[in-house]
Amino acid sequence: MAAAAASSCGGAGCGPHCSSSASAAAVEDAAAAAAEKVGRLSLSRECGKCGGGAAAVAVAGGLGLCGECFRANLLGKFKLAVTSNAMVRPTDSVLLAFSGGPASRVALQFIHEMRCKAIESWDVSNSQALPVFGVGVAFVDESVLCSKPRDEIEMAIEDIRSIVSSLSTGVKAMHIARLEDVFSTESEDGERRLREAVDMIGDDTGREDFLRCLRMLSLQKIAMENGYAKIMLGSCASAIACHVLSATVKGQGYSLPADVQYVDTRWEIPVVLPLRDCLAQELTLLCELDSLKTQQHLDRPSNGINSLVASFIKRLREENPSREHTIVRTAQKLKPFSFNKFSADGYHDFLPSRLRPKFQKFDSDESTFSEILCLMCGSPFSESELQNLESTKHKAQKKIDLYTAHCCQSCYFQILPAGENLNEHFFSLLPKLWTGKMDTISDSHSLLRDQIEEYLLEENDDGN
């Protein structure tokens, strides 16, 4: 009797139609364990899409999907974002920013699969006219500011390498850049300057935002030095929802539309967000289902406003899982900037004819990017910030005045140290990729002022 029970509930002789209560309980326990591990999930008995009898799971209160349909749904969102927004052209080389977390891990997997599919299509094509886009991976090493033991850090970085190298084909190169490299000069290592600059920022929120700006600067540096045409971020709907609320609290409402679009061309190398419609819970669950290895050992704890907002979003998610999508959709209704789309001549020639008109119908006034951007965070200036900048240009006596005027109000109050002398030293520590632009503007301003003064003196001499 015991043997019969064992063979009918998962033993070696268990048949495909076994209906043992013990077996059902085991399945339910496994599903509950997965739900607890991933977060608040809705469990159902069957898939709402294919109607299969397998256990189904849904995130954010959506329709229950089996594992295959759930994965296909996320991949479909990713592909739709990439193709309908012309994120990647066949001639592009794309740099994927990889942090080791679930979002960037899924982005890496999906873009890898898209490239493999493109290679297959190219192989069977008779003309083989269009090339296949390339993919590189970048990881910004911030361990210089981490208190963890060095051997743990090196082990985590090695895990990052192994995750990328586990992909069979398609990755052009793996770039691991130290955060302090953007501070380095020919005569000085950047670690001291980075530490000193960070220590001068007294506000926890400002310190986090400053590091986020440096992270983007590091990615831009990698992309420019290695010939990449796009930078792909793993920012998902959950992360964007947190950013929407935190930016509102910080007074960055004017520049907010720039950060929530699929495409952002204000940078030297354009940035794209193909996971904008996917929730963090969904991406974490997919990593669990597909056994996609992640590495988050190097994540730094969040403090200040960003931490409070993340906790608030978590509470909202527990009450109503769809709140994150609601926040993002609300922010998307704000009017985007001219740099939130690709509008270069000939850019969309590779697109299918049915999609091309969508991108060619733009106002000629919006085709030229004319926004003034913050020196550090890249936020477009509001009207009041522009007025302050113009006023400072006319009366500025020192270079530091132009530096501070080229910072948005959020960076000015949260990142810059108080006091003119401290500001001068702080700006002297910043990467040349930032201050070099301001030096050029300052020199042009000084030259123009000298020419005006010389002209006025000549007029006075003629009058005498």
Curated annotation (Swiss-Prot):
Q: Which HAMAP family match?
A: CTU2
User: In which family does this protein belong, per the annotation?
Assistant: Belongs to the CTU2/NCS2 family.
Q: Which GO annotations describe the biological process of this protein?
A: protein urmylation; tRNA wobble position uridine thiolation
* Task performed by this protein: Plays a central role in 2-thiolation of mcm(5)S(2)U at tRNA wobble positions of tRNA(Lys), tRNA(Glu) and tRNA(Gln). May act by forming a heterodimer with NCS6/CTU1 that ligates sulfur from thiocarboxylated URM1 onto the uridine of tRNAs at wobble position.
- Its protein name is Cytoplasmic tRNA 2-thiolation protein 2
Query: Would the keyword S-adenosyl-L-methionine turn up in this protein's UniProt record?
Result: no
Organism encoding this protein: Oryza sativa subsp. japonica
- Which InterPro entries does its entry note? CTU2, Rossmann-like_a/b/a_fold
- GO cellular component terms, A-Z: cytosol
Where does it primarily localize? Answer: cytoplasm
Superkingdom is: Eukaryota
Keywords of the record: Cytoplasm, tRNA processing
Return one GO MF term.
Answer: sulfurtransferase activity
Q: Pathway involvement?
A: tRNA modification; 5-methoxycarbonylmethyl-2-thiouridine-tRNA biosynthesis
Q: Which gene encodes it?
A: CTU2
